[in-house]
Design a protein with these regions (language model features):
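Short, glycine-/small- and polar/acidic-enriched structural segments
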Residues: 2-133, 140-143, 159-165, 179-181, ...
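Short polybasic/polar patches that bind polyanions
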Residues: 24-25, 30, 129, 172, ...
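Short amphipathic alpha-helical segments at helix boundaries and their inter-helical linkers
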Residues: 56, 60, 154-155, 254-267, ...
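Phosphate-coordinating loops and pocket residues in cytosolic domains that bind phosphorylated ligands
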Residues: 108, 173, 294
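Pocket-lining segment of extracytoplasmic ligand-binding domains
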Residues: 148-238
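Secondary-structure end/capping motifs
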Residues: 202-283
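Conserved C-terminal helix/tail region of periplasmic/extracytoplasmic solute-binding proteins
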Residues: 274-303
Length: 303
Protein backbone atom coordinates (compact mmCIF):
# COMPACT_ATOMS: atom_id res chain seq x y z
CA UNK A 1 0.00 0.00 0.00
CA UNK A 2 1.31 3.45 -0.93
CA UNK A 3 2.29 5.82 1.84
CA UNK A 4 -0.17 8.54 2.82
CA UNK A 5 0.86 11.84 1.22
CA UNK A 6 0.80 14.88 3.49
CA UNK A 7 1.71 18.45 2.59
CA UNK A 8 3.42 19.75 5.72
CA UNK A 9 4.00 23.48 6.15
CA UNK A 10 7.26 24.48 7.82
CA UNK A 11 6.53 27.75 9.63
CA UNK A 12 10.04 29.15 9.05
CA UNK A 13 13.58 27.79 8.99
CA UNK A 14 14.88 27.62 12.56
CA UNK A 15 17.28 25.43 14.53
CA UNK A 16 14.62 24.90 17.19
CA UNK A 17 12.74 22.80 14.63
CA UNK A 18 15.52 20.20 14.63
CA UNK A 19 13.14 17.32 15.61
CA UNK A 20 11.10 17.83 12.44
CA UNK A 21 14.18 17.94 10.21
CA UNK A 22 15.65 14.85 11.87
CA UNK A 23 12.43 12.89 11.36
CA UNK A 24 12.56 13.79 7.67
CA UNK A 25 16.24 13.05 7.02
CA UNK A 26 16.31 9.78 9.00
CA UNK A 27 13.15 8.51 7.35
CA UNK A 28 10.97 8.33 10.47
CA UNK A 29 7.95 9.73 8.65
CA UNK A 30 8.38 7.17 5.89
CA UNK A 31 8.72 4.37 8.45
CA UNK A 32 5.32 5.37 9.79
CA UNK A 33 3.68 5.16 6.37
CA UNK A 34 3.85 8.83 5.40
CA UNK A 35 5.10 10.56 2.27
CA UNK A 36 5.85 14.08 3.51
CA UNK A 37 5.87 17.00 1.09
CA UNK A 38 7.65 19.53 3.32
CA UNK A 39 7.06 23.09 2.12
CA UNK A 40 8.49 26.25 3.63
CA UNK A 41 5.52 28.52 4.28
CA UNK A 42 5.68 31.87 2.45
CA UNK A 43 4.93 33.64 5.75
CA UNK A 44 4.04 32.77 9.36
CA UNK A 45 0.50 34.05 8.74
CA UNK A 46 0.09 31.69 5.78
CA UNK A 47 1.18 28.74 7.95
CA UNK A 48 -2.27 28.80 9.58
CA UNK A 49 -4.37 30.37 6.82
CA UNK A 50 -3.08 27.87 4.27
CA UNK A 51 -4.62 25.05 6.28
CA UNK A 52 -8.01 26.74 6.37
CA UNK A 53 -7.86 27.43 2.63
CA UNK A 54 -6.63 23.93 1.77
CA UNK A 55 -3.13 24.75 0.50
CA UNK A 56 -1.53 22.46 3.11
CA UNK A 57 -2.69 19.56 5.28
CA UNK A 58 -0.70 20.06 8.48
CA UNK A 59 1.61 22.79 9.79
CA UNK A 60 4.16 22.99 12.54
CA UNK A 61 4.54 26.22 14.44
CA UNK A 62 3.32 28.04 17.51
CA UNK A 63 -0.12 27.46 19.08
CA UNK A 64 -0.13 31.25 19.33
CA UNK A 65 -1.34 31.41 15.74
CA UNK A 66 -4.19 28.98 16.47
CA UNK A 67 -5.18 30.96 19.56
CA UNK A 68 -5.27 34.15 17.49
CA UNK A 69 -7.64 32.55 14.97
CA UNK A 70 -9.92 31.22 17.72
CA UNK A 71 -9.88 34.63 19.38
CA UNK A 72 -11.55 36.20 16.34
CA UNK A 73 -13.63 33.22 15.19
CA UNK A 74 -15.54 31.04 17.65
CA UNK A 75 -15.98 28.50 14.85
CA UNK A 76 -12.30 28.38 13.89
CA UNK A 77 -11.51 24.88 12.55
CA UNK A 78 -7.85 24.76 13.67
CA UNK A 79 -6.63 22.42 16.40
CA UNK A 80 -3.16 21.63 17.80
CA UNK A 81 -1.64 18.26 18.61
CA UNK A 82 1.75 17.15 19.88
CA UNK A 83 4.26 19.36 21.71
CA UNK A 84 7.56 19.27 19.82
CA UNK A 85 9.35 22.37 21.13
CA UNK A 86 8.47 22.66 24.81
CA UNK A 87 10.41 25.77 25.81
CA UNK A 88 11.13 29.21 24.43
CA UNK A 89 14.13 29.06 22.04
CA UNK A 90 14.89 32.79 22.19
CA UNK A 91 17.98 34.23 23.84
CA UNK A 92 19.04 37.70 24.96
CA UNK A 93 22.53 38.52 23.69
CA UNK A 94 24.35 41.59 25.04
CA UNK A 95 27.45 43.52 24.09
CA UNK A 96 29.07 42.97 27.50
CA UNK A 97 29.00 40.08 30.00
CA UNK A 98 26.14 40.03 32.51
CA UNK A 99 26.36 36.86 34.62
CA UNK A 100 23.86 38.18 37.20
CA UNK A 101 21.10 39.15 34.77
CA UNK A 102 17.72 40.29 36.02
CA UNK A 103 14.89 41.84 34.03
CA UNK A 104 15.49 45.25 35.63
CA UNK A 105 18.73 45.30 33.59
CA UNK A 106 16.61 45.86 30.49
CA UNK A 107 15.59 49.34 31.63
CA UNK A 108 17.83 51.78 29.76
CA UNK A 109 19.79 49.85 27.11
CA UNK A 110 18.57 49.82 23.51
CA UNK A 111 17.06 46.41 22.80
CA UNK A 112 16.30 44.80 19.46
CA UNK A 113 13.12 42.88 20.23
CA UNK A 114 12.16 39.93 18.01
CA UNK A 115 8.94 40.85 16.24
CA UNK A 116 9.21 38.63 13.15
CA UNK A 117 6.39 36.72 14.87
CA UNK A 118 4.31 37.84 17.89
CA UNK A 119 5.22 35.21 20.50
CA UNK A 120 8.75 36.38 21.51
CA UNK A 121 7.61 39.85 22.53
CA UNK A 122 4.42 38.52 24.12
CA UNK A 123 6.38 36.19 26.37
CA UNK A 124 9.07 38.80 27.10
CA UNK A 125 6.56 41.48 28.08
CA UNK A 126 4.87 38.93 30.35
CA UNK A 127 8.21 38.10 31.98
CA UNK A 128 8.84 41.81 32.52
CA UNK A 129 5.43 42.35 34.11
CA UNK A 130 5.89 39.35 36.41
CA UNK A 131 9.27 40.79 37.44
CA UNK A 132 7.69 44.16 38.27
CA UNK A 133 9.04 45.95 35.18
CA UNK A 134 6.65 47.97 33.01
CA UNK A 135 7.10 46.60 29.45
CA UNK A 136 6.55 50.12 28.11
CA UNK A 137 9.57 51.36 30.06
CA UNK A 138 12.19 49.59 27.99
CA UNK A 139 13.92 51.20 25.01
CA UNK A 140 13.08 48.75 22.26
CA UNK A 141 13.57 48.59 18.51
CA UNK A 142 10.63 46.70 17.00
CA UNK A 143 10.49 47.69 13.34
CA UNK A 144 13.25 45.39 12.04
CA UNK A 145 13.77 41.67 11.58
CA UNK A 146 16.08 39.52 13.67
CA UNK A 147 18.51 39.45 10.77
CA UNK A 148 18.52 43.26 10.63
CA UNK A 149 18.92 43.50 14.41
CA UNK A 150 21.87 41.11 14.18
CA UNK A 151 23.60 43.46 11.74
CA UNK A 152 22.87 46.50 13.93
CA UNK A 153 24.18 44.69 17.01
CA UNK A 154 27.45 43.92 15.24
CA UNK A 155 27.74 47.60 14.34
CA UNK A 156 27.28 48.52 17.99
CA UNK A 157 23.96 50.28 17.38
CA UNK A 158 22.03 47.97 19.71
CA UNK A 159 23.02 47.00 23.26
CA UNK A 160 20.95 43.81 23.46
CA UNK A 161 19.05 41.66 20.98
CA UNK A 162 16.37 39.01 21.40
CA UNK A 163 17.10 36.28 18.83
CA UNK A 164 16.86 32.56 18.27
CA UNK A 165 19.43 30.26 16.70
CA UNK A 166 21.37 30.50 14.49
CA UNK A 167 21.47 34.29 15.01
CA UNK A 168 22.59 33.85 18.62
CA UNK A 169 25.48 31.62 17.54
CA UNK A 170 26.53 34.20 14.95
CA UNK A 171 26.59 36.95 17.57
CA UNK A 172 28.43 34.85 20.14
CA UNK A 173 31.08 34.11 17.52
CA UNK A 174 31.47 37.86 16.92
CA UNK A 175 31.94 38.67 20.62
CA UNK A 176 28.43 38.86 22.05
CA UNK A 177 27.45 37.44 25.43
CA UNK A 178 24.44 35.42 26.55
CA UNK A 179 22.42 37.46 29.05
CA UNK A 180 19.36 35.29 29.39
CA UNK A 181 17.85 32.11 27.98
CA UNK A 182 14.06 32.31 27.93
CA UNK A 183 13.96 28.52 28.22
CA UNK A 184 14.51 29.02 31.96
CA UNK A 185 10.83 30.02 32.12
CA UNK A 186 9.94 26.34 31.78
CA UNK A 187 7.62 24.51 29.41
CA UNK A 188 5.34 26.77 27.40
CA UNK A 189 4.08 24.65 24.45
CA UNK A 190 6.13 26.71 22.00
CA UNK A 191 5.70 24.52 18.92
CA UNK A 192 3.15 21.88 17.93
CA UNK A 193 1.54 20.38 14.88
CA UNK A 194 -1.78 21.91 13.88
CA UNK A 195 -4.42 21.21 11.26
CA UNK A 196 -8.12 21.67 10.69
CA UNK A 197 -10.36 19.59 12.91
CA UNK A 198 -11.86 18.04 9.78
CA UNK A 199 -8.45 16.88 8.56
CA UNK A 200 -7.55 15.45 11.98
CA UNK A 201 -10.84 13.58 12.29
CA UNK A 202 -10.72 12.27 8.71
CA UNK A 203 -7.02 11.32 8.83
CA UNK A 204 -6.59 10.11 12.38
CA UNK A 205 -4.14 7.37 11.46
CA UNK A 206 -1.93 9.77 9.48
CA UNK A 207 -1.86 12.31 12.33
CA UNK A 208 -1.04 9.50 14.74
CA UNK A 209 1.81 8.53 12.40
CA UNK A 210 3.17 12.09 12.55
CA UNK A 211 3.23 11.85 16.33
CA UNK A 212 4.95 8.45 16.27
CA UNK A 213 7.63 9.76 13.90
CA UNK A 214 8.34 12.81 16.05
CA UNK A 215 8.55 10.71 19.20
CA UNK A 216 11.19 8.62 17.43
CA UNK A 217 12.98 11.85 16.56
CA UNK A 218 12.83 13.22 20.11
CA UNK A 219 14.14 9.93 21.45
CA UNK A 220 16.99 9.99 18.92
CA UNK A 221 17.90 13.56 19.91
CA UNK A 222 18.13 12.68 23.59
CA UNK A 223 20.20 9.57 22.89
CA UNK A 224 22.59 11.02 20.30
CA UNK A 225 25.54 13.39 20.32
CA UNK A 226 25.25 16.84 18.81
CA UNK A 227 27.67 15.74 16.10
CA UNK A 228 25.43 12.84 15.06
CA UNK A 229 22.38 15.07 14.89
CA UNK A 230 24.26 17.77 13.01
CA UNK A 231 25.62 15.30 10.45
CA UNK A 232 22.08 14.12 9.69
CA UNK A 233 20.52 17.58 9.30
CA UNK A 234 23.05 20.32 8.56
CA UNK A 235 23.86 19.49 4.91
CA UNK A 236 20.18 19.63 3.98
CA UNK A 237 18.75 22.41 6.15
CA UNK A 238 21.67 24.54 7.44
CA UNK A 239 24.50 24.12 4.91
CA UNK A 240 25.75 27.64 5.65
CA UNK A 241 26.57 26.69 9.26
CA UNK A 242 29.85 25.03 10.16
CA UNK A 243 29.54 21.63 11.86
CA UNK A 244 30.92 23.15 15.07
CA UNK A 245 28.39 26.00 15.01
CA UNK A 246 25.37 23.72 14.62
CA UNK A 247 26.72 21.33 17.26
CA UNK A 248 27.06 24.24 19.70
CA UNK A 249 23.47 25.26 18.96
CA UNK A 250 22.19 21.72 19.52
CA UNK A 251 24.08 21.38 22.79
CA UNK A 252 22.76 24.71 24.09
CA UNK A 253 19.20 23.75 23.23
CA UNK A 254 19.60 20.29 24.77
CA UNK A 255 21.03 21.84 27.94
CA UNK A 256 18.05 24.22 27.98
CA UNK A 257 15.61 21.26 27.81
CA UNK A 258 14.08 22.88 24.76
CA UNK A 259 12.94 19.56 23.34
CA UNK A 260 10.65 17.42 25.49
CA UNK A 261 11.03 13.69 26.08
CA UNK A 262 7.68 13.02 24.36
CA UNK A 263 5.00 14.87 22.40
CA UNK A 264 2.51 14.93 25.30
CA UNK A 265 1.06 18.45 25.54
CA UNK A 266 0.35 19.31 29.19
CA UNK A 267 -2.42 21.72 30.14
CA UNK A 268 0.05 23.72 32.25
CA UNK A 269 2.31 24.44 29.27
CA UNK A 270 -0.60 25.64 27.15
CA UNK A 271 -1.94 27.83 29.97
CA UNK A 272 1.47 29.49 30.46
CA UNK A 273 1.58 30.45 26.78
CA UNK A 274 -2.02 31.62 26.76
CA UNK A 275 -1.42 33.77 29.85
CA UNK A 276 1.38 35.64 28.06
CA UNK A 277 -0.80 36.29 25.01
CA UNK A 278 -3.64 37.52 27.22
CA UNK A 279 -1.41 39.81 29.28
CA UNK A 280 0.06 41.32 26.11
CA UNK A 281 -3.35 41.90 24.54
CA UNK A 282 -2.69 39.67 21.52
CA UNK A 283 -5.83 37.74 22.43
CA UNK A 284 -8.76 38.82 24.58
CA UNK A 285 -10.59 35.52 25.09
CA UNK A 286 -9.60 32.91 27.67
CA UNK A 287 -9.93 30.00 25.24
CA UNK A 288 -10.19 26.54 26.86
CA UNK A 289 -7.46 23.94 26.36
CA UNK A 290 -9.91 21.35 25.01
CA UNK A 291 -10.98 23.73 22.25
CA UNK A 292 -7.41 24.23 21.04
CA UNK A 293 -5.67 20.92 21.77
CA UNK A 294 -6.40 17.30 20.84
CA UNK A 295 -4.93 15.82 24.00
CA UNK A 296 -5.53 12.17 23.15
CA UNK A 297 -3.75 12.49 19.83
CA UNK A 298 -0.79 14.33 21.38
CA UNK A 299 0.53 11.65 23.71
CA UNK A 300 3.25 9.19 22.67
CA UNK A 301 1.05 6.16 23.32
CA UNK A 302 -1.89 7.42 21.29
CA UNK A 303 -5.53 6.82 21.89
Amino acid sequence: MANKQITLYENLRACSYTPFYLAQTLGFFEEEGLDINLQLSPSPTETAQGLIDGRADVSFGGPMRVLMHHNTDDNCPLICFGQVVARDPFILVGQTPNPTFCFQDLIGPKIGVATDVPTPWMTLQDDLSRAGVNPNSINKSVDKTMQEHTVLFKKGELDIVQVFEPYAQELLESGGHVWHRFSTRGDIAFTTFYATRNFVNSNRFACRSLIKAINKSLNKIHQSSAAEISDAIRPFYFPYLTPNAYENIINRYKDSKLWPKTTALPVESFVRLKAALLSGGLIQKDIPYDRIVDQELSGPEGE
